[in-house]
Amino acid sequence: MRTIQLIAGLAAVGTMSMASPDAVAADQDRSRFSDEPAPLKIEDFPERPKPLLEIGDKFLGPGNLQKGFTLPTGAVWHPSLWVFGNYRSAIQTFDTGTARTTEWVNDLNLFANVQLAATERILVGFAPLRNDNGQFTGYNFEPNHRGVEDFNENSLHPRTFFFEGELGELFPRWDKSDRRSLDYGISLGRQPLTLQDGILVNDDSIDMVSITRNALLPGFGSHLRLSGIFAWNEIERGNNFEDRSAYLFGLDGFIDMPKSTVEADLLYLSSGTQVDGFFAGIGSIQRIGKIATTFRVNQSIAVEDPNVGIQSGTMLFAEMSLEPAYTHNVLYVNGYWGIDDFTSAVRGPLAGGPLGRTGLMFAAVGLGSYGSPLSNAGQRSAGGALGYQMFFGELRRRQLTFELGGLSPTDGRNGQATALGARFQQALGTRTVLVLDAFGALRENSRESFGGRMELLVKF
């Protein structure tokens, strides 16, 4: 017995001595994953963000789902109600160079989500502190001709009220073997609609129906999605004013290709009182080396004589961003070229112009009378923004962004403008964000423009 143990020990020593230096180095490499399973570290994991009210299954909660009930169609529903929303309150001043507005303004968005199943739900939303024209509740300090006054704007009309689901999940008995490819998404009611990153369409409340074919597998890509759109009410034209006689017809497409994601849209807007229009857009999203890029081309065509609601033109737009080495920060350069008088098909009253994605100096804040430092219409002009966004803290709960923006008319008009601005954001707790904005702008043949704001955003 002792002889056998001695032979085994000598064999083990021989095996270790014959191990290659590379194998030994690999075992001692600190970057090598351990063979021992590590426990899940949940001590520093944030608590579940409970909504304002939840009945039924918990939002992002652990445990089993309700048993539910079966519909005659075969669908199994287990309804749950989640009530959530956000509150925005800001003190802000905006000086255009000719007039100054200083105000305290508030907005409240409340939503009730009835989750019927994983793919079916009904969402109802209200904005009780603003009216249907996008005017908010608050207190006005300037201009003087308005006097110091409070303004109470409210509306109990639902800003959101729609149902969405999937045909195959609503009627599973039609295709028990899952061979008919009933992957058709359905959305009906008052809902937001954004196309081409908000350049072609940007409206937070439009009455529409859409039917979407998901999970198509073309030979030249991994995923193709096609949607048909029809809208009949709450349609604001490109000048942000509602056209009560307008109807919108559209096709929206999305495809994942080996090196790019491509979005394409084709729209026709018919009106009984204003000019009809054709609209088209195509965009490509990809990485070129270490640079994330987006390129978009959008076109508007007035069928008859153009007016403020629809004009003919082309908008070229590009975004580029990267993370500088050894940081988690973002350096970005965005630019546009507006050829003739491009007009968006649909723009909500708070959406501003089509160039909001160019940068902070072009974006509308969507709250009160605080405008964009630089014009975001983009007609017959070219411009862009250079910005640097920094993140601070282990959890990146603090951000600071500096941006330089500018534009110049391309038709010989006066109107060159340059703006420099900054935004600071700080997370407070798990539901609140403090936002500070400031800018200064120089415009050709005009006085300086400046503005600043402090906003508190609470999500619940």
PLM segments and residue spans:
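Outer-membrane beta-barrel "beta-signal"
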Residues: R447-F460
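Outer-membrane beta-barrel channel domains
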Residues: A38-I42, A99-W232, G452-R453
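Short loop/turn motifs that connect adjacent beta-strands in outer-membrane beta-barrel proteins
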Residues: K67-V83, N113-I122, L167-Y184, L216-R225, ...
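N-terminal periplasmic/intermembrane-space "pro-region" immediately following the signal or transit peptide
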Residues: L10-T101, F111, Q115-T119
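Outer-membrane beta-barrel architecture
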Residues: T70-T73, N109-F111, F162-E164, S210-T212, ...
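Signature for the C-terminal beta-barrel architecture of outer-membrane proteins
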Residues: E166, D183-G185, Q191-L355
